[in-house]
Amino acid sequence: MTNLTLMNQLTPKQIVEKLDQYIIGQTGAKKSVAVALRNRYRRQLMDESIRDEIIPKNILMIGPTGVGKTEIARRIAKIVRAPFSKVEATKFTEVGYVGRDVESMVRDLVEVSVRLVKEEKMQLVRVKAEKNAEKRLIKLLAPSQKKKQTTSQNPLEALFGSMNQPDEPAEEEVDQELKNKRSQIEWRLQNGELDDEIVTVEVKEQQNPMFDMMRGTGMDQMSGMQDALSGMFPAKKKKRKVTVREAKKILFEDEASKLIDSDELAAEGIHRAEQMGMIFIDEIDKIASKEGGGNAQVSREGVQRDILPIVEGSQISTKYGTVNTEYILFIAAGAFHMSKPSDLIPELQGRFPIRIELDKLTQEDFYKILTEPDNALIKQYKALLKTEGIDLIFTKEAVERIAEIAFQVNQDSDNIGARRLHTILEKLLEDLLFEAPEINMESIKVTENYVNEKLAPIMTNKDLTQFIL
């Protein structure tokens, strides 16, 4: 199912309901993002003459950390399988300085988009790819005597590998005995009897980790050069010993890749990134420039001016082709404790017409976060201890007390929102998680007294609270 089909099925109200399953409160932010998403679907249905005139209304989320800014954007991208990339504005530097190039956010988005499209296409060819992979695996488990190849190899081929190297193995001699053996292996393979056997397979070597490091240190051009050079020579292969279970996955991916048109994959990946992509720019308040900032102000303003043309719409070169950023939805977010949105350069402010102020979390919100979402923290800890054969039970009073402590600690020290619950629950259940394998009990009840016993000594000491909770 494509993301356009998914959006067709979901109204803004239904999108908000889906977000409610994971995120408590922040109704205004959910509505704005849901409307922005639905507008993208509406735009796809318009005549081409007016479609190009309608650009996404970018969103600026304002609110303290831990209230759900990132989670709203990430969840909505998952709901409709839209390409989504999260970047931190503080990682970027002006052109000419050491740091990440702002264009890398678009390249990251295209990588995600191509991967999504590839996953969908692999599902379409799954049956044929699995059949081909099984044939290869059977031949590896029951090899034959290959006919000797008499073709000589010139020195350049010996050095770089043949440019027209066939993927298929050399012609083989198959007698009746080998056919019978392979038939038996095929039956055992399909019944999972050989899953733990060891087999040697050829896999493509991963790219040099040095180039991966360069992607994160601002030398994106160098990693781009490596991508270009990698296409000039055939990929090197190395032999690995793996289980049959793992070999099935490796050979399936290899066979599926052969059945997918790489040019079509790149074109569709770029199109989806352009039309459906979402880029979340976090900590944008950290690059807001204020008067009297000196060199730091100049640098921050420079980053804003580098981001501006991408948000406005420009052509960015990637290894898959050129990407037009005009119709990508940008969602920026920041706490704006030390600055305000008006500290951003006017041109950039104008590119984020929808402003949403997210609410601070209340004690009641903390209680709901602990109990209501599908991925609620308490449900997660229950599932963890269930693997040890222990039913973990929280009384209502215990959960209320945890919510009260989380709210109070946020009030007394730095407000880190819902992330405070992670710290408190980890401290509360630390001993239980450590001793669980040795505990011979079917169920354990966490009461209000237990919460007070574990957390009260820390709560009464302000210094300990700041360091531990």
From Swiss-Prot:
List localization entries.
Answer: Cytoplasm
Q: One MF term from GO for this chain?
A: ATP binding
The record's principal subcellular location, in a coarse class, is cytoplasm
Q: Per the record, what is one GO cellular component? A: HslUV protease complex
Presence of the UniProt keyword Cytoplasm in the record: yes
Q: State the similarity comment.
A: Belongs to the ClpX chaperone family. HslU subfamily.
UniProt function note: ATPase subunit of a proteasome-like degradation complex; this subunit has chaperone activity. The binding of ATP and its subsequent hydrolysis by HslU are essential for unfolding of protein substrates subsequently hydrolyzed by HslV. HslU recognizes the N-terminal part of its protein substrates and unfolds these before they are guided to HslV for hydrolysis.
Q: What is this protein called?
A: ATP-dependent protease ATPase subunit HslU
> What gene name does this entry carry?
hslU
